[in-house]
Amino acid sequence: MGNSLRCISQEQDPNQKKPSSVVNGNSSEKHVRRLSLIPSFRRRTLLPSLSCSGSSTSSTSKKGGIKTKKKIRERHHQEQHHHDHEKDSLIQDQTLAATNILFSQTPRNSNSAPPFRRSTSVVYTQPPTAAVAASVGSVSGALTPKKSTYGYVRSSSNRQRSSTDPVLKPNQLLDKELKVEGAETKRFVLVHGGGFGAWCWYKTITLLEKHGFQVDAVDLTGSGVSSFDTNNITSLAQYVKPLLHFFDTLKPTEKVILVGHDFGGACMSYAMEMYPSKIAKAIFISAAMLANAQSTLDLFNQQPDSNYDLMEQVHLFLYANGKKNPPTAVDFDRSLLRDFFFNQSPPKDVALASVSMRPIPFAPVVEKLHVSEKNYGSIRRFYIKTMEDDYAVPVSLQDAMIKSNPPEQVFHLKGSDHAPFFSRPQSLNRILVEISQLPPKKSS
């Protein structure tokens, strides 16, 4: 296009008088028509070169062309800057509008949290409204805990909370600092139940350590990370040996708060008889609290027949020495663990237990425990009752133990299954801290 314009300029005689627009209107129209073929976005850059080609020997024309180019660049820069400014303003307006929409959906005159939840443990603290249920549609069934074939509530992360449930609401600060003052000792020792291991206390350990306690969780022989074969355990003393070794390593004047769950109650009772001076308090959590000359098997034979069918199917006897001899261990049917032990626990904890639980040695279960009032009876005992959702150690059995061997004080933990360290870790932690702060009894 630029070459054609230069050809037009060269054909004209430089000595020829410039015709007026009236006389040579056709020539002017032809020249204008040629210029109109140039796209509008290229005219600004071509016109200065056109004027330069017409008077290439004139320095004034050259200076004028340079100034024109400079003005064009400045004008282009100003237009680009104005365009960027308008674009930034538009983005700011859109951001402000989105923010207004967000805050308009959040109640301003309430203490409730925004509708963003990291935890999925409890989404609906109350039954959902009809509008919410309609919006959920096909997944509305997830709001109601499922039931197993035995009629027991399966583990569900959105179980509706009871009005008497002591656990904090999701929009409250669950890690709010507890004041720990006046504790006789700030060291806890946790003893797991039958089939469990130190791994089951991971939530409790975290919460207690956050409040300044020193916490030790023991793996009993053949449990947790112990490589010992449970079929070869022949006595209660052999089973609790790691716990006894722990007490042997304590300083002479050091005391601990001993906590046991399930069959761990019998194990801690054995240690209480041997190390009474090193135990400040003993806490039984839905645990076997045996009387003198009583075995854990004797205790569980008192269990009502209501859960007998499920209990019989959950427990699988192992006969390492042949079926003509007594069982050597008791294993679990993994498909029934949720119904029996963890019907209120989060699914992730149920999965952890299903791959971590190990058989219970049978010999310690049938061994009768011998305790004395002088040693075992001198230690302050506390019992934490799990309520109606505990099918492994029902409330009736816990009440029978409490009646026959009364502790100093009983605490109730509602809404928990047999594993409160999974289903109600915050509530369990508060009770443990509360017991730790109870002042020591004055000697008479």
Swiss-Prot record:
UniProt-annotated location(s): Plastid, Chloroplast
Enzyme class: hydrolase
Residue ranges with Basic and acidic residues bias: 81-90
Basic residues composition bias: residue spans: 64-80
InterPro entries, A to Z: AB_hydrolase_1, AB_hydrolase_fold, MES/HNL
Annotated segments matching region Disordered: 1-36, 48-91
Catalytic residues of the enzyme: D262, D390, H418
Single annotated GO MF: hydrolase activity
Domain AB hydrolase-1: 188-312
Transit peptide as recorded in UniProt: 1-58
Pfam families to which the protein is assigned, alphabetical: Abhydrolase_6 (PF12697)
Primary site of residence: plastid
CC annotations in GO: chloroplast
Biased composition (Low complexity): 53-63
EC number per UniProt: 3.1.1.-
Keywords: Chloroplast, Hydrolase, Plastid, Transit peptide
Compositional bias (Polar residues): 1-27
Family indicated by similarity: Belongs to the AB hydrolase superfamily. Methylesterase family.
Annotated function: Putative methylesterase.
PANTHER family linked: METHYLESTERASE 15, CHLOROPLASTIC-RELATED, METHYLESTERASE FAMILY MEMBER
Protein's recorded name: Putative methylesterase 15, chloroplastic
Lineage of source species: Eukaryota, Viridiplantae, Streptophyta, Embryophyta, Tracheophyta
Gene (name only): MES15
